């Protein structure tokens, strides 16, 4: 069995920038209020003609071009999203068609903001067993389409975007590199803390569900905050323990970009410095499943990761779910 490694990454975000000042004109809020509580300054918003699959394809094409892998060489496409183009077919199948990846199986997975890490875990297992060689994992969201723009507690938080990674097996002599440790978890008993109540088989769309705004994101921010700070620390330490490492061994820590206060509290608990922590949420807000792959792509583009670095990807989200992935670069 061989480890999987990330061959290349790519990202796509909409051109439209929606600032805190723009939000001041819509709801009772202010730039200082949003910044002090979240760290977010702006977010990208997809137009009415842009769906999750469109951003996914754009990010995927960039990652494929960097990797040198042709779409026809892909064996699998995984799209992590809570905002698919439609209930079915899957967004991954739409991406497969648009890329021309006719040899790839394709499916979506839903683990909210942890989705990209779940996708990496699945892909790494298929590659490790030599049943699949090249796998495309995408985290992609158009959360602006399910945000209540009259709710100041949630509309300030979310943005749209997509990040993609092409995975393949490590080469001879690289056996100690690649995706070397994971920890994943879930607690469905806390599902109501972060949800989109209607639109599924439990509450199909009706005039009543639309008028009562049950198709928008609902969140208990205080409880999610407490959960996030604890679970970021727990999942990071579990993944490190599996490979006999500590937080001191981490060269770059890339957390889910949800809230600056969450990141600060979690990294303080872990003893990870600001210098080792990558943050870009000020530019994008919370992009759910796209958050971590977009951050990873930007960290690579900014030359913040060098050979043999230990990189930690750590996420949490609706479900509730959480996860961590350690990569020896």
UniProtKB/Swiss-Prot annotation:
Keywords from the UniProt entry: Acyltransferase, Cytoplasm, Fatty acid biosynthesis, Fatty acid metabolism, Lipid biosynthesis, Lipid metabolism, Multifunctional enzyme, Transferase
Residues of the signal peptide: none
Domain comment, as recorded: The last Arg residue of the ACP-binding site is essential for the weak association between ACP/AcpP and FabH.
SUPFAM superfamilies documented for this protein: Thiolase-like
Protein name from the UniProt record: Beta-ketoacyl-[acyl-carrier-protein] synthase III
Species lineage: Bacteria, Bacillati, Bacillota, Clostridia, Natranaerobiales
GO-annotated cellular components: cytoplasm
Domain of life per record: Bacteria
EC number(s) stated in the UniProt entry for this protein: 2.3.1.180
Region ACP-binding, annotated ranges: 257-261
Swiss-Prot/TrEMBL GO biological process terms: fatty acid biosynthetic process
Keyword Ribonucleoprotein annotated: no
Active site annotation, chain numbering: 113, 256, 286
Species of provenance: Natranaerobius thermophilus (strain ATCC BAA-1301 / DSM 18059 / JW/NM-WN-LF)
InterPro entries, per database record: ACP_syn_III_C, ACP_syn_III_N, FabH, Thiolase-like
Main location group: cytoplasm
Annotated localization: Cytoplasm
UniProt catalytic activity: malonyl-[ACP] + acetyl-CoA + H(+) = 3-oxobutanoyl-[ACP] + CO2 + CoA
Reported function: Catalyzes the condensation reaction of fatty acid synthesis by the addition to an acyl acceptor of two carbons from malonyl-ACP. Catalyzes the first condensation reaction which initiates fatty acid synthesis and may therefore play a role in governing the total rate of fatty acid production. Possesses both acetoacetyl-ACP synthase and acetyl transacylase activities. Its substrate specificity determines the biosynthesis of branched-chain and/or straight-chain of fatty acids.
CDD domains in the cross-refs: KAS_III
Family designation: Belongs to the thiolase-like superfamily. FabH family.
Pfam families listed in its UniProt record: ACP_syn_III (PF08545), ACP_syn_III_C (PF08541)
Molecular function in Gene Ontology: 3-oxoacyl-[acyl-carrier-protein] synthase activity; beta-ketoacyl-acyl-carrier-protein synthase III activity
Pathway named in the protein's UniProt entry: Lipid metabolism; fatty acid biosynthesis
PANTHER family named among the record's database cross-references: 3-OXOACYL-[ACYL-CARRIER-PROTEIN] SYNTHASE, BETA-KETOACYL-[ACYL-CARRIER-PROTEIN] SYNTHASE III, CHLOROPLASTIC
């Amino acid at each position: 069995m061989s480890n999987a490694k990330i061959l290349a990454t790519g990202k796509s975000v909409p051109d439209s920038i929606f600032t805190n000042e723009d939000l001041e004109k819509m709801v009772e809020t202010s730039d200082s209020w949003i910044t002090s509580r979240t760290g977010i300054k702006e977010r990208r918003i997809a137009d009415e003609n842009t769906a999750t699959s469109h951003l996914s394809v754009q990010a995927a094409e960039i990652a494929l071009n960097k990797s040198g892998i042709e779409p026809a060489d892909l064996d699998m496409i995984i799209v992590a999203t809570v905002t698919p183009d439609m209930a079915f077919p899957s967004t991954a199948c739409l991406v497969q068609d648009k890329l021309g990846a006719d040899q790839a199986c394709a499916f979506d997975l839903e683990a909210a903001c942890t989705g990209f890490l779940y996708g990496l875990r699945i892909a790494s297992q298929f590659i490790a067993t030599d049943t699949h060689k090249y796998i495309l994992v995408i985290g992609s969201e158009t959360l602006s389409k399910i945000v209540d723009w009259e709710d100041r507690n949630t509309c300030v938080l979310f943005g749209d975007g997509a990040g993609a990674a092409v995975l393949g097996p490590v080469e001879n002599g690289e056996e100690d590199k690649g995706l070397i440790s994971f920890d994943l978890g879930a607690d469905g008993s806390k599902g109501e803390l972060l949800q989109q109540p209607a639109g599924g088989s439990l509450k199909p769309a009706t005039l009543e569900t639309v008028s009562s705004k049950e198709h928008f994101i609902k969140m208990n921010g205080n409880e999610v905050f407490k959960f996030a700070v604890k679970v970021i620390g727990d999942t990071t330490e579990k993944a490190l323990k599996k490979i006999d490492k500590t937080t001191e061994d981490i060269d770059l820590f890339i957390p889910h970009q949800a809230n600056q206060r969450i990141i600060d509290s979690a990294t303080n608990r872990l003893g990870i410095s600001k210098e080792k922590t990558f943050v870009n949420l000020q530019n994008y807000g919370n992009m759910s499943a796209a958050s971590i792959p977009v951050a990873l792509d930007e960290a690579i583009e900014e030359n913040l990761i060098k050979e043999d670095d230990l990189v930690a990807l750590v996420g949490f989200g609706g479900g509730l779910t959480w996860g961590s992935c350690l990569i020896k670069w």
